């Protein structure tokens, strides 16, 4: 790869990794093209990006943003703003491809995290699920109050 192309890639990644909240990385050794395409499709649907990047270029891009990270072997980098949804996608992919896809860690809000952290994040509810829970909790007392009023009205009408 030419030096100018490498510089361009590093600049692009530095901007991406600055603007994005989280970057996951995983070993994809042994993955088929079909498996990687399925992962990329799922990531795109979650408005994220997935790309195989040379470790040195990724390390420099992170260093440009003040993050010290070391990468070994083959890595696919997955990044986007919705860290919980992306964590769920890659954890599900890792479970379905245990021998060929291993989550190594993540860089979330400027901190390097391990694979166990990614697994814990994947168990959290997504933003949409949380909003649904809040809406349900807000609706429940109103529904109970309306039910009580209806029973009171029925009782008054029957008297």
From Swiss-Prot:
Forms part of the ribosomal stalk, playing a central role in the interaction of the ribosome with GTP-bound translation factors. Keywords: Ribonucleoprotein, Ribosomal protein, RNA-binding, rRNA-binding. NCBIfam families: PRK00099.1-1. Gene3D superfamilies: 3.30.70.1730, 6.10.250.290. This is Large ribosomal subunit protein uL10. Part of the ribosomal stalk of the 50S ribosomal subunit. The N-terminus interacts with L11 and the large rRNA to form the base of the stalk. The C-terminus forms an elongated spine to which L12 dimers bind in a sequential fashion forming a multimeric L10(L12)X complex. One of its GO terms (cellular component) is ribosome. One of its GO terms (biological process) is translation. Belongs to the universal ribosomal protein uL10 family. HAMAP family: Ribosomal_uL10. GO terms for molecular function: large ribosomal subunit rRNA binding.
């Amino acid at each position: 790869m030419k030096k100018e192309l490498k510089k361009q890639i590093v600049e692009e990644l530095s901007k991406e990794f600055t603007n994005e909240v989280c970057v996951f990385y995983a070993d994809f050794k042994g993955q088929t093209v079909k498996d990687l395409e399925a992962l990329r499709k799922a990531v795109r649907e979650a408005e994220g990006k997935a790309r195989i990047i040379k470790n040195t270029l990724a390390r420099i891009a992170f260093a440009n943003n003040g993050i010290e990270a070391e990468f070994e072997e083959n890595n696919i980098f997955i990044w986007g703003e919705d860290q919980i949804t992306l964590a769920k996608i890659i954890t599900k992919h890792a479970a379905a491809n245990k021998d060929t896809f291993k989550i190594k860690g993540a860089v979330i809000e400027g901190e390097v995290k391990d694979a166990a952290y990614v697994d814990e994040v994947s168990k959290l509810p997504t933003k949409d699920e949380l909003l649904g829970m809040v809406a349900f909790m807000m609706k429940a007392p109103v529904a109970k109050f309306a039910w009580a009023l209806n029973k009171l009205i029925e009782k008054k009408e029957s008297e």
